[in-house]
Design a protein with these regions (language model features):
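Anionic-ligand-binding alpha/beta catalytic cores of soluble enzymes and soluble regulatory domains
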Residues: 3-52
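Phosphate/ribose-recognition catalytic cores of enzymes acting on nucleotide-derived substrates
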Residues: 1, 39-156
Length: 156
């Protein structure tokens, strides 16, 4: 007999980070969905990497970290990007316990505030790290973006 697939089993697979298995079992890509909300505006300011933030409160999250992802808004084609899932210790302080989902859409400057998006993480790039300062975080974000573009085979 095969594995019995239930919602609890899927949640466990996602929490362990096996998003390929979760997607195959769901019959569709595993995704994080929600309305884009305002964040601290630090990503677009200091980090020069604007993000679309969605609340993580009701979502089943994979392990904290950075992922190469596809982002879908409405009926538009998926846009390549990068997503951070975690509690943003460098920006918000260690142990704040409140997870966020922040997606940077490559080459997209559309105002998404209030619109529903689906974030489809496809490749884990690295775990969540506390950086000594925003500049160190910014340098790592640039490396993460390059890694995500490579993983998603972006042509830019």
């Amino acid at each position: 007999a095969g594995t019995r697939i239930s919602s609890s089993w899927i949640r466990n697979v996602v929490s362990e980070g096996d998003l390929s298995l979760a997607s195959a079992s769901l019959g569709r890509p595993y995704s994080l969905c929600g309305a884009v909300t305002h964040g601290k505006e630090m990503a677009s300011g200091t980090l020069k990497c604007p993000t679309a933030n969605i609340s993580a409160d009701a979502l089943q999250l994979p392990p904290y970290g950075v992922y190469a992802a596809w982002i879908v808004c409405g009926g538009s084609p998926p846009v390549p990007g990068i997503v951070y899932i975690g509690d943003a210790p460098t920006i918000r302080g260690e142990g704040n316990g409140h997870a966020i989902v922040e997606a940077n859409l490559f080459g997209c400057s559309v105002d998404l505030y209030g619109r529903d998006i689906s974030v489809i993480p496809v490749r884990f790039l690295r775990g969540s790290i506390t950086f000594p300062n925003p500049e160190a975080l910014s340098r790592q974000v640039a490396r993460d973006v390059a890694a995500a573009k490579s993983a998603l085979e972006c042509k830019e």
